Amino acid sequence: MLGLFKKKVTVVTHNGSFHADDVFACATLSLWAEKENINLKIVRSRDDNIIKKADMVVDVGDIYDPEKGRFDHHQRGGAGEHDNGIQYASFGLVWKKYGEQICDQEIAKTIENKLVLPIDAIDNGVNVSKNLREDVKEYSVAREMIYPLRFSPDGKGFEHFIEIAKIILKSEINMLRQITDQQKRVEKEIESQLEPEILILNEDIYWDKVVTSHRKIKAAIYPEPDASWWCAEVARDDLTDYNSNRASFPESWRGLRDEALVNISGVPEAVFCHRAGFFAVAKTKEAALEMARCALQN
């Protein structure tokens, strides 16, 4: 019965082919509506009469006026820019108003930088990356996944990708909430262990980003989620650069496992060492700690 009394909001976006910005803009509004217990209806049309009657208009209509629910960026002069100069597309305009209503300010800003900015940039014809190798191309969800269905005559492709976009947004929000909570716990561990060279964690949580600002820490050990194995991993100055490792496991260990690794390392419970030398696995906490110490001495 409660559903009968939901506030109803109609959103109009353009029909025809679609792109990531209008898909994610509508997905954002759908998540906002779910949180606010609003009955949201999405209509795809370029008819001026339908657009005028809509409660919200996204990526069509040539008007940007968030107070009136208008979120287009195609008009002369555009609809403004992000702080870094990238022009807003419809996703960015909608996220600017509703992102913090779906999640908190810090998470909304992170999602803007991670997801909104590249989609807005692509929609405005701005390249944000280049291939470092000619024989390997980057796979973009924003482009490759949407393209095959964006011309679907029955419009089902658009509905399908709104659901995918909602899953992506929910996943990002939930992940960032977990990371924020876990990083606070890591900071407490670092403080309680007096910023050690080897950080000992009793759970598998997001530690690596926190450790980048604690230069004394060279490695961490932590259990697998099911506690069947213990992992030893070196810390990095830059999480995007494996050349910034603060330590490394011995060259002679790399790529070995089980008996071969036990024989060369002298650690009876050693299980595996990654061939790049930044990660190793042991059967026990004590063995993982011993392997981490070897990495620091290497």
Regions found by a protein language model. Give the residues of each.
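Glycine-rich, Lys/Arg-enriched anion-binding loops that position phosphate/diphosphate groups
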Residues: 126-235
